[in-house]
Amino acid sequence: MRSFLQQDVNKTKSRLNVLNGLANNMDDLKINTDITGAKEELLDDNNFISDKESGVHKPKDCQTSFQKNNTLTLPEELSKDKSENALSGGQSSLFIHAGAPTVSSENFILPKGAAVNGPVSHSSLTKTSNMNKGSVSLTTGQPVDQPTTESCSTLKVAADLQLSTPQKASQHQVLFLLSDVAHAKNPTHSNKKLPTSASVGCDIQNSVGSNIKSDGTLINQVEVGEDGEDLLVKDDCVNTVTGISSGTDGFRSENDTNWDPQKEFIQFLMTNEETVDKAPPHSKIGLEKKRKRKMDVSKITRYTEDCFSDSNCVPNKSKMQEVDFLEQNEELQAVDSQKYALSKVKPESTDEDLESVDAFQHLIYNPDKCGEESSPVHTSTFLSNTLKKKCEESDSESPATFSTEEPSFYPCTKCNVNFREKKHLHRHMMYHLDGNSHFRHLNVPRPYACRECGRTFRDRNSLLKHMIIHQERRQKLMEEIRELKELQDEGRSARLQCPQCVFGTNCPKTFVQHAKTHEKDKRYYCCEECNFMAVTENELECHRGIAHGAVVKCPMVTSDIAQRKTQKKTFMKDSVVGSSKKSATYICKMCPFTTSAKSVLKKHTEYLHSSSCVDSFGSPLGLDKRKNDILEEPVDSDSTKTLTKQQSTTFPKNSALKQDVKRTFGSTSQSSSFSKIHKRPHRIQKARKSIAQSGVNMCNQNSSPHKNVTIKSSVDQKPKYFHQAAKEKSNAKANSHYLYRHKYENYRMIKKSGESYPVHFKKEEASSLNSLHLFSSSSNSHNNFISDPHKPDAKRPESFKDHRRVAVKRVIKESKKESSVGGEDLDSYPDFLHKMTVVVLQKLNSAEKKDSYETEDESSWDNVELGDYTTQAIEDETYSDINQEHVNLFPLFKSKVEGQEPGENATLSYDQNDGFYFEYYEDTGSNNFLHEIHDPQHLETADASLSKHSSVFHWTDLSLEKKSCPYCPATFETGVGLSNHVRGHLHRAGLSYEARHVVSPEQIATSDKMQHFKRTGTGTPVKRVRKAIEKSETTSEHTCQLCGGWFDTKIGLSNHVRGHLKRLGKTKWDAHKSPICVLNEMMQNEEKYEKILKALNSRRIIPRPFVAQKLASSDDFISQNVIPLEAYRNGLKTEALSVSASEEEGLNFLNEYDETKPELPSGKKNQSLTLIELLKNKRMGEERNSAISPQKIHNQTARKRFVQKCVLPLNEDSPLMYQPQKMDLTMHSALDCKQKKSRSRSGSKKKMLTLPHGADEVYILRCRFCGLVFRGPLSVQEDWIKHLQRHIVNANLPRTGAGMVEVTSLLKKPASITETSFSLLMAEAAS
């Protein structure tokens, strides 16, 4: 290196002229200052470093000697340890920002090797150094008289420092004295920036094939002096300061004499295989300064991902350059974690001057491709085309922050907050800078704290600015949520289209949600006189005119009459020809809407006039009035109201259907004159709901004068008749309709209130669809009849059948004024009306109905005409008209006849509590609509033309489409029940509900081992039915065969018997056997039974009562023992069982005891005499036991007859509630099984008393509730009282809870008591 430097000193001036020309081009470069507050110009280097702080002496002129001014050189005697300590992270930063407000006064220490090669002098000829963003430029000036040994030693020291073992990122830094402000920020320490004019050389080879490539060059031009002899020194130096040891085998030491820096630099410029090592991005440091003195250009760069792509050249004159902290977030990284690469280039001969110039020109970076916003530091850079291409490639792979394009978001490196706009990030970074400023170290109060993140601020304005960040973030989240909630319109190509707007979607759920939005937009019109609500104003006006008699102008009435006449003629022509020709225009009846498509009109009326107009199927024609059919008569509004009231009371008081159609009676039915048929109901879900929806709204008489309805009111409540006066002929067969008239050959009878009347039916081929007519009245005392319009004087037959009783039918009202319903109208009806299922109420006289079905022929049921008649039908026949526009259907319920004779339901028996039954008629051959009969209390039966095929079933069987389980045969009525059932399958199989579509049903069914019950038609499992049957059966099934204990459920008995088996040592048995079966098998075996008795006798345990707690709330009671009628004379009802002679003796004794009891003195004497009497009973029992074999007593037969049933209504007058039970103490020997002991209470325990031997020493006390005997000395009363207190607490008394009740303790077999068992009982009582 020394020889190399000496050759450079002897270079000619022509060599320098080339570089001087290049340097002169940089004179106009200026420094851009970005940070506010940097208002001072950049001072000279001698002003930045004081003698006190850094020990750098101010040069007096530019020609001072090296020995005088080069005082920044550290002694080379510093060990590597000291140099490493100097480079440690604990040391303060080395770059001091001259213009920043956070200038620290701390001294800095230069590590070993960071020697200054030249004097600290600045003249007017000093050149500026241009660098890329994130790089450090330094300008070196070295006088001519400086010995070359210093440069060599400096390079040697630098090389030694480079080859040192890496410890930390800060230990591998090469420290430079910068000529300008390097702007970087340490997150933990304040940054210090030092302007320098020293140069540092490195004698490290940068080979092309090495794993560390140089991405920048350091070009040091050594200033010779004012005499013009400049020395150009170009050297390649790679400074790899990284936190990770990247290997030092690629470096060359100073002893390598074969190193040619010029050739290597040319090779670096010309090669295309250069790669750029990527490292984590750090703060970008750059500086520029225009110097009036000729200086060689030097540049220092670092390894970053940006590859100089964001650099830009912004010249300025002697201005301090600061970091734009608000535009970039990467400048917050520490300076000691950066990487630099130094290079020196020096051509050897003047022949390569042009080549060198070309190389420098190729290094000039095009600033047009640099985004001004992407780099906080704008510097100029020299790059080759190869490096530019590779930088562009690396930029495409790098994060969006370093891309030339606008990034999608701006992240903050201090916290996890992203910003879409740069200004928001700038504002956010101000708070981070504020927290790391020197004010943080001062005791400045920060009373303002953010509630959301907890940051504190000095003033309120800062807090308000900070809160904008959270507010904008919330707004952003709300916008995203709002976008998610908005329903996406898929356009007209979607499968589901909204009929009210242009919304379309393929998702049914989305379509339903969209439909709900239209419901919110609806406006309802409320009636002031009632609770009626209308969707349209026209509907409200019609309601007021019909229900309240208000004078309103209906838009339908005031419509163009001529237009409707034209429509009527067109329709009549089409009705004769057939349904092939159709009207071209369809007009809505409620609004001026017209359309040529019938389906469009249907949807229009369905969605817009669904509640105001019953005809939602939009039949535009066929409702026109005919003058020939009109009998203009005044309308009595009072009779209209009477009819409305009568119709509202048609249903039973508690009928569910009345609740369902309550609004229909008050609202929709009044406007039903505008239509004939109601809209098609939705899918039937429930039986009750299906009945309500299957009927059409009831028609009320219209009170408007223009309506063709005549209602004659009679003061004497004479019946009113409605009938058809004229009919017009049409092509019936073409329309598949029939005319129903009287048929004289066959007379059908209607039985009403014990009287019968003839019904005439006549069949005729040519007819119209107006074959069914309703003749009803508005009076509760009227009768309905059937008559012939052409022969009104037809007489009644003299003979008829009294037993005929038929069901109440639903009918369609057909008015006289409407002549026919053609094919056009019929096409507008829904398909379900063509094949309508008829459901009518079944009268409970099924036997007579069956007879009538057998006597009728099929021809009589084909076509009939239904009319109404009364006892004065012929004499008082007065015909009036009814508008066909009132054609409606409605289901009619009729409750069962309470006063029905028992013989009437012999064939088909119905329970009186079963509710409604219906008859099912299916008529698909002709449109035989049902007929409606008003006033069911007076008119019970009517007849209609229905098909012969019928069936009777309960109303719960009407419904519904059963849903079957895919894993078992169970069926369900609702999807909710099926879903819960399927969840049970999946839960037992260990699967989640979502896995039902993944796993096959066969696998789930096989893995589910639970026994399933097939559901019946009503969805009730068989298991529940079995429970109901068990409750209704005799309770003797739940009696323990061993001890006689009774239980209300089989489960309680099973648990009780399980305790018996456990005490007997039987703890294991077959899984398919119940404990009750195991005990019965053991008792059937006599040997095992004897062992059981011995085992039980060996345990001296006080027996417990077996009284179910549910008995207190039940109506009957099953006692353990039998209380005969003679015992208490209280009239208790007992079952008659065989009583042995011994039992009779016991009963006689008990009766004698009852007779002698009133003579006994009260008080203590009564108790003592009772004890004496008990001892007598003991002797009597011993005498009886001597005559009866003990073995026969304990056999199984005696056990079975032990317990009897007794119905004890526990009323207040029952003597069991107040009188002590009269029982023989000898009866308790049968209760010899061990019962579960109750929990012992806290306190003193009962002492086990020895069995006394004398009768005078023993007191025997008995419990009046359970009959338990307490035997012992006088102190036994204490236990007896405590026992009674438990009963009182748990007794069925007011405000004491339901618990034990008073029972009898008398047994039926006193002869079965032995001396041994009695002594055992005494011992148990004493214990």
Curated annotation (Swiss-Prot):
SUPFAM superfamilies to which the protein is assigned, alphabetical: beta-beta-alpha zinc fingers
Family label: Belongs to the krueppel C2H2-type zinc-finger protein family.
Superkingdom of source: Eukaryota
GO biological process: regulation of transcription by RNA polymerase II
SMART domains per record: ZnF_C2H2
Effect of Y1089C: In MYP21; uncertain significance
Function summary: May be involved in transcriptional regulation.
Biased segments, Basic and acidic residues type: 788-801
Clinical disorder: Myopia 21, autosomal dominant: A refractive error of the eye, in which parallel rays from a distant object come to focus in front of the retina, vision being better for near objects than for far.
Consequence of substituting R683T: In MYP21; uncertain significance
UniProt main location, coarse: nucleus
Organism: Homo sapiens (Human)
GO molecular function terms noted in the UniProt entry: DNA-binding transcription factor activity, RNA polymerase II-specific; RNA polymerase II cis-regulatory region sequence-specific DNA binding; transcription corepressor binding; zinc ion binding
GO CC annotation terms, alphabetical: nucleus
Covalent link location (Glycyl lysine isopeptide (Lys-Gly) (interchain with G-Cter in SUMO1)): K346
Keyword Transcription regulation set for record: yes
Subcellular location(s) per record: Nucleus
Tissue specificity remark: Expressed in liver, placenta, retina and retinal pigment epithelium.
Covalent link location (Glycyl lysine isopeptide (Lys-Gly) (interchain with G-Cter in SUMO2)): 39, 82, 112, 168, 185, 193, 213, 263, 284, 294, 299, 319, 339, 344, 346, 388, 390, 485, 509, 553, 573, 589, 598, 603, 627, 641, 645, 658, 676, 712, 718, 720, 727, 733, 762-763, 791, 795, 817, 835, 843, 962, 1009, 1031, 1088, 1094, 1110, 1133, 1157, 1165, 1176, 1192, 1205, 1234, 1308
Annotated region (Disordered), positions in chain: 126-147, 779-804
InterPro entries: Transcr_Reg_ZincFinger, Wiz_C_Znf, Znf_C2H2_sf, Znf_C2H2_type
Protein name in the entry: Zinc finger protein 644
Residues found modified as Phosphoserine: S199, S309, S820, S1000, S1189
Zinc finger (C2H2-type): 410-432, 448-470, 496-518, 525-548, 586-609, 963-987, 1038-1060
